Regions:
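Metal-dependent DNA phosphodiester-chemistry modules and their immediately adjacent helices/loops
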Residues: 216-235
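Modules that initiate DNA replication and primer synthesis
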Residues: 2-38, 169-216, 226
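TOPRIM metal-binding catalytic domain and adjacent DNA-binding surface shared by DnaG-type primases
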Residues: 1-19, 23-102, 110, 118-135
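A generic structural motif
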Residues: 162-164, 212-221
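Phosphate-handling DNA/RNA-contact segment within nucleic-acid enzymes
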Residues: 84-184, 200
Length: 235
């Protein structure tokens, strides 16, 4: 199977981030379903490919434009740093089931995403912070959205996000299914676009009937809800 290495804009439908690039060169847009065949050779894109090696150093700070406090970023290990090329990025640090750091997911100002380390070993983002059981857990599409929901609830709720966004929702939820099934309710708060809605439809049947709840919002995602409408709109 090919491995997704990044998401980005789709030239066919204009979606800003639904077009997934895979390591054999093919692309698939989860919004308009456009498939572009690759060459079969490994795809190399500067600042977008999966890279291994020493992890990046970052500084934890408040993300004011996102409405996120330093304390929230510290809790999730979300920092600001730079790629070895010097490109400024935000860095989400991922851990494996044992709690060890195994990968980092980076994002630059142009929404280019890349992995450092071994993303295949990574659990859901924030899974290491969770109790593993309880009344409710919220699953968001992106890391910033997970931080947003967590902060809105005083960083007391269990909140996680998908490592690969909407396109990797089924694989990620299946991998962590036993963990997620430990909760009475699993709330899916994916982006309010076609890719997000499709992702919800693909994963909801994984769970025990009645366990999944779908969060509905008039905004694009949880962070936009927090920034534009405030904490009460999230909670």
């Amino acid at each position: 199977d090919s491995l997704q290495v990044s998401t980005g804009p789709c030239p066919a439908c204009g979606s800003s981030d639904a077009n997934a690039l895979y390591d054999d060169g093919h692309t698939y847009c989860h919004s308009c379903k456009t498939h572009v065949q690759g060459t079969g050779e490994p795809t190399i894109r500067k600042s977008r490919t999966v890279r291994s090696g020493v992890f990046l150093n970052g500084e934890v700070r408040a993300l004011n434009k996102r409405g996120l406090t330093e304390a929230t970023c510290q809790r999730f290990g979300y920092s600001v740093g730079a790629l070895r090329s010097g490109v400024p990025v935000q860095i989400a640090t991922y851990r494996d089931a044992g709690g060890s750091i195994v990968a980092q997911h980076t994002r630059d100002a142009d929404k280019n995403f890349a992995w450092v380390g071994d993303s295949k070993q990574a659990t859901l983002y924030g899974e290491n912070l969770c109790r593993g059981s309880g009344r409710r857990i919220v699953v968001t599409e992106g890391e910033i959205d997970a931080l947003s929901v967590s902060q809105a609830f005083g960083n007391t709720w269990d909140v996680v996000s998908l490592p690969g966004g909407a396109s990797g929702a089924l694989k990620a939820c299946r991998k962590s299914l036993s963990f997620l099934e430990g909760y009475d309710e699993v709330v899916l708060w994916f982006d309010a676009d076609e890719a997000g809605r499709t992702a919800v439809e693909t994963v909801v049947d994984l769970f025990t009937p009645g366990r999944c709840k779908i969060a509905l919002s008039t905004r694009k995602d949880a962070n936009e809800t927090l920034v534009l409408d405030g904490v009460k709109a999230v909670t």
